[in-house]
């Protein structure tokens, strides 16, 4: 991290320690935005810095208007009463293939059905868990703007197996039910695993938690033709199954949609909404698409990362020479309107084999050997300028809105970036109901590290990118070329600098500096 100047205030030292703890997220899943507030007048105008060749590109238009003209309203406090369902087959760390059907009632009770599958398209159900309990919504989250914190109590868990093979496996794993000893489990029957009334709990072997209910965000999307889509985001699941029970969410899973107000093209929504534990949803079979990275890919929405970090991503892949370029735009707000910093990275990649661990996934190895950073607000400029030594570009030379190459200094110590860097990635592709190609890459490790060994390769995915251009421009961007900007701001690693302020609050409340 480097030592602070002797006259650096002790509090600023805490900021640096806090920022270093969170800024270690590198490469494809890079980074996060930040919580540090800033006046919009301090942000550099993105349009004035936009590269000419990107002005009219479809990718730029997509990144400039992620909502595609729709009006999005976040409701606080969140009224989550209703029936909420998955929009597709979800992949959780492990991996686990799952669909969800959650009902929340006016009296604070909930009934959650989690359907588990043998395959990555959710066509072969193996068992269903029915979880009943109570939830109480608390204050607005201080980690993620627009989110609400919640507390929950599980009162009842029931399991239903959908094959004899699964019944035998679960029966051996749990070795008890609340009805007393069972000789053997049978498919199609419900087995009580937890009962608040009797004090029985046979569910520990499932490693089940509903900590996702500790963080919620409700959005209403008003589309052009008057249709309203309601989306409920629940807290993320830790990538390490051994940490799942203790994890308090700081980002989100894929959104659930209201069973009455979902996207009209959502086939999975309709199937899941009318399913139950005795008749689990079976989604339409689909073929796995071969992962073809060639072209340009961009974020579909303002993405949320752990600790309330926000960003947009734009990747360019060159299949002819297996090189890649990445633009990361970081923000301090969940609408991606207040920029903090941007980062440009490039390197090489190698195409691997089909994953033996994650059905439908393909393994890649990515190397990053070139990086440029552009601070987009004053706090980050100060953060970058205060470090001793030429370990993050030229010492003391950072200016607002001016890009600097950090390759010669082997990255940027201030931001926790080391070059060269290697990551072991997981990808999959699919086509949505509108015919668009979507690209998923591996979820970042929940402990804040990077997947720099094969053993740390992801078993689940981040939010998808959409192909916005089938071909890619020839060659890398050379020194002196403008970083493409997007209206509303551009930010990658800068948001992490702002996150330092939020983490400072944590440090000051948890331990002395």
Regions found by a protein language model. Name each.
Residues 1-23, 492-497, 513:
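Classical eukaryotic N-terminal signal peptides for Sec-dependent ER targeting/secretion
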Residues 6, 26-29, 499, 504:
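Preference for solvent-exposed, low-hydrophobicity sequence contexts
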Residues 22-61, 67-76, 288, 483-486, ...:
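N-terminal signal peptide
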Residues 46-50, 55, 65-76, 80-83, ...:
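N-terminal glycine/threonine-rich, aromatic-flanked beta-hairpin/loop signature
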Residues 54, 176-212, 219, 257-279, ...:
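Eukaryotic intrinsically disordered, low-complexity regulatory regions
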Residues 99-104, 133, 208-225, 309-318, ...:
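Broad, structure-driven detector of short, well-ordered beta-strand segments within folded domains
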Residues 111-113, 150-152, 225-241, 322-327, ...:
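Short, hydrophobic/proline-enriched secondary-structure or compact coil segments at domain edges
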Residues 470-500:
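C-terminal GPI-anchoring signal of eukaryotic secretory precursors
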């Amino acid at each position: 991290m480097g030592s602070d100047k002797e006259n650096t205030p002790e509090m600023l030292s805490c900021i640096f320690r806090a920022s270093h703890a969170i800024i270690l997220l590198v490469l494809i899943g890079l980074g996060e935005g930040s919580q540090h507030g800033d006046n919009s007048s301090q942000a550099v105008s993105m349009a004035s810095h936009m590269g000419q060749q990107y002005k009219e590109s479809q990718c730029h238009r997509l990144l400039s208007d992620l909502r595609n003209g729709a009006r999005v309203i976040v409701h606080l406090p969140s009224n989550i009463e209703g029936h909420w369902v998955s929009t597709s087959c979800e992949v959780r760390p492990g991996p686990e293939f799952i669909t969800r059907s959650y009902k929340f009632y006016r009296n604070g009770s909930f009934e959650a059905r989690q359907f588990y599958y043998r395959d990555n398209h959710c066509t072969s159900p193996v068992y269903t868990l029915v979880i009943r309990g109570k939830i109480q919504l608390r204050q607005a989250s201080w980690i993620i703007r627009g989110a609400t914190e919640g507390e929950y109590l599980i009162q009842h868990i029931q399991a239903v197996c959908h094959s004899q093979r699964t019944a035998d496996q679960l029966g051996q794993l749990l070795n008890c039910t609340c009805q007393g000893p069972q000789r053997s489990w049978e498919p199609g029957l419900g087995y009580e695993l937890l009962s608040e009334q009797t004090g029985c709990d046979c569910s520990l072997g499932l490693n089940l938690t509903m900590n996702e209910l500790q963080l919620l965000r409700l959005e209403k999307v008003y589309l052009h033709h008057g249709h309203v889509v309601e989306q409920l985001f629940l807290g993320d699941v830790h990538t390490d199954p051994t940490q799942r029970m203790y994890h308090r969410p700081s980002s989100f899973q894929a959104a659930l949609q209201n069973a009455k107000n979902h996207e009209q093209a959502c086939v999975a929504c309709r199937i899941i909404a009318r399913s139950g534990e005795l008749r689990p949803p079976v989604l339409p079979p689909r073929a796995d698409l071969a992962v073809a990275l060639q072209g340009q890919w961009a974020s579909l929405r303002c993405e949320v990362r752990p600790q309330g970090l926000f960003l947009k991503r734009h990747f360019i892949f060159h299949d002819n020479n297996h090189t890649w370029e990445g633009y990361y735009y970081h923000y301090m707000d969940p609408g991606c309107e207040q920029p903090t910093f941007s980062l440009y990275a490039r390197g090489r990649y190698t195409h691997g084999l089909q994953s033996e661990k994650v059905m439908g996934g393909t393994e890649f190895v990515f190397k990053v050997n070139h990086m440029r950073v552009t601070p987009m607000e004053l706090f980050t400029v100060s953060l970058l300028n205060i470090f001793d030594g030429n370990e993050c570009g030229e010492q003391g030379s950072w200016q607002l809105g001016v890009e600097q190459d950090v390759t010669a200094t082997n990255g940027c110590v201030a931001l926790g970036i080391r070059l060269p860097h290697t990551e072991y990635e997981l990808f999959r592709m699919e086509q949505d109901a509108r015919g668009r190609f979507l690209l998923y890459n591996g979820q970042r490790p929940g402990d804040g590290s990077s997947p720099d060994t094969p053993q740390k390769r992801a078993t689940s995915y981040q939010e998808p990118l959409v192909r916005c251009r089938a071909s890619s421009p020839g060659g890398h961007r050379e020194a002196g070329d403008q970083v493409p900007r997007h209206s509303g701001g551009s930010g990658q690693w800068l948001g992490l600098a702002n996150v330092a302020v939020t983490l400072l609050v944590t440090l000051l409340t948890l331990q002395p500096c």
